A protein has these predicted regions:
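Catalytic strand-loop segment that frames the active site of acyl-thioester-processing enzymes
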Residues: 1-46, 50
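A broad, structural micro-motif
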Residues: 31, 63-65, 111
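HotDog/MaoC-like acyl-thioester-processing domains
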Residues: 1-16, 72, 77-78, 88-151
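Glycine-rich, flexible loop/turn motifs
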Residues: 21-23, 27, 59-61, 117, ...
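Residue-level recognition of specific faces of alpha-helices
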Residues: 36-39, 64, 117
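Short, electropositive, low-hydrophobicity segments enriched in small/polar residues
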Residues: 32-36, 56, 130
Length: 151
């Protein structure tokens, strides 16, 4: 099976350090794939909060994660501090993409690259809704273009 084609961005808008807990380990003794997705969620919530938003109120709309792509590059263990860098781009009529780079600052190890597709959602109406202008503006700003680094 071919690997997901995810490349790092040239610039990320936000970073947060998170600690790998014992409960984040799988039977192999390293960070489990399900737990990585949970840590990405933590990073996403912190990124949104840094812009004054939340998943329930992102510039006036709710957010739902429509898809996720993870590409593992290395293992992480209990006690490791991981750096989650978050970028934003690819604005669409009803959504956008978030990009993540996960590294271990202690030794510079690459742990993962990931993307999540976020869908704007009106919980009152129970349907997708248009991307708010402030989010679109951030997606298209000079640092939020989603421009990829060279392969």
């Amino acid at each position: 099976m071919p690997r997901a084609d995810i490349r790092a961005l040239r610039h990320y808008l936000f970073m947060v350090d998170l600690k790998v807990r014992i409960t984040d380990l799988n039977y192999g003794g390293h960070l489990g794939n399900d737990r990585l997705l949970g840590l990405l969620h933590e990073a996403r919530v912190a990124f949104l909060a840094s812009n004054g938003w939340s998943e329930m109120n992102c510039a006036g709309v709710g957010l739902i994660m429509g898809d996720a792509v993870l590409r593992y590059q290395g293992q992480a263990y209990a006690g490791d501090i991981l750096r989650f860098e978050v970028g934003i781009g690819e604005p669409r009529r009803c959504g956008f993409r978030l990009y993540y780079r996960v590294t271990r600052p202690a030794d510079g190890a690459a742990i993962a690259l990931a993307e999540t597709g976020m869908v704007c959602f009106d919980y009152r109406e129970g349907k997708m809704c248009p991307l708010p202008a402030p989010v679109k503006d951030l997606c298209t700003s000079s640092l939020g273009t989603g421009e990829r680094a060279d392969p």
